Design a protein with these regions (language model features):
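Acidic, Mg2+-coordinating active-site environments of NTP-dependent enzymes
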Residues: 47-49, 102, 108, 125-264
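Phosphate- and divalent-cation-binding pockets in alpha/beta enzyme and binding domains
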Residues: 62, 66, 115-117, 170-174, ...
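Conserved nucleotide-sensing/catalytic segment adjacent to the nucleotide-binding pocket
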Residues: 89-115, 119
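Amphipathic coiled-coil/heptad-repeat helices and related helical stalk/stem segments
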Residues: 38, 91-92, 147-151
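Short, basic phosphate-binding NTP loop
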Residues: 2-55, 62-76, 94, 191-195, ...
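Short beta-strand-centered segment that lines the nucleotide-binding/catalytic pocket of NTP-utilizing
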Residues: 75-86
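ATP-dependent NMP and nucleoside kinases share a basic, alpha-helical "lid"
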Residues: 116-128
Length: 264
């Protein structure tokens, strides 16, 4: 099942200068009420599935599709709602309902910063929260401070597993986010859970070698570009947190061909 579209626990966050809780605006209260209402309307189906959220400035949809294919290769029933653009609360909860009816036990969803800021994901049980990257601000992207503030709404929802990019320039800020059960990282650093050892870029694809402890494995994708290596590593880290073998990870990533993806 594939869709394509154009709370507060502060112990892991930087301490504020004041102990006073920030005042919730009327707009935010309305957004949260709408999210709760839609969840109830559809019978709160996400409680019977595991929710994987991928956020970041770029690559969210690519990582989500990689994870979708990996889970399929692992024999899981999985639905994906993937876009590098925005997402509406009504669309998200309808997706959960249809995924549940289709028998899915995993939902993989992209979580853009504006949707997080607008409380689209309010009240949801997050199994995995993964961060791709933060690119330098432009006319269409927020500052690091506002981006971090938006992203924190996802990581304050007590995700069981957190996946972070050690190669990102803002990793020192994001490293404050930890999972209630597990935290994994990926990148070229020796300390990364999934370490990027080397990569080869071709005209019609990308190949990369990774390490998971003493286990070495290779992934190849139809997608091209240096950033694809990081996206594969992110997907591999998410899959590793779900106890999926490296062979299955490689198979799933190889199976993703964007030309074959159709909207459900």
């Amino acid at each position: 099942m594939c869709y394509n579209l154009p709370m507060e626990n502060t112990k892991n966050l930087p301490k504020s200068k004041s102990n006073t809780k920030p005042k919730i605006s009327f707009k935010a209260k309305t957004q949260r009420a709408r999210a709760k209402l839609l969840s109830s309307y559809y019978g709160n189906p996400i409680r019977d599935m595991k929710l994987i959220c991928v956020t970041g400035t770029s690559g969210k949809a690519t990582v989500a599709h990689f994870v979708h294919e990996i889970l399929r290769s692992a024999g899981q029933h999985v639905a994906v709602l993937a876009s590098d653009g925005s997402i509406k609360t009504s669309v998200l909860h309808k997706f959960f309902s249809e995924a549940w009816k289709a028998g899915s036990n995993y939902c993989v969803v992209t979580a853009p910063a504006d949707a997080l800021k607008n409380n689209v994901f309010y009240g949801l049980p997050i199994h995995v929260a993964a961060l791709t990257d933060f690119l330098s601000p432009s006319l269409t992207t927020p500052t690091p401070e506002s981006f971090l503030e938006s992203e924190s709404t996802l990581f304050q929802m007590n995700p069981e597993i957190v996946v972070l990019n050690e190669d990102d320039a803002n990793y020192p800020d994001f490293s404050k986010f930890v999972g209630t059960e597990q935290t994994l990282t990926y990148g070229t650093a020796r300390s990364s859970t999934i370490r990027i050892d080397s990569a080869k870029l071709y005209k019609k694809g990308t190949e990369a070698n990774f390490s998971l402890g003493s286990n070495h494995f290779t992934c190849a994708s139809f997608l091209t570009g240096e950033t694809v290596v990081s996206y594969m590593a992110c997907a591999a880290a998410i899959a590793t947190s779900l106890h999926i073998s490296t062979d299955t990870i490689s198979e799933g990533i190889a199976n993703y061909n964007p030309d074959n993806v159709t909207a459900a």
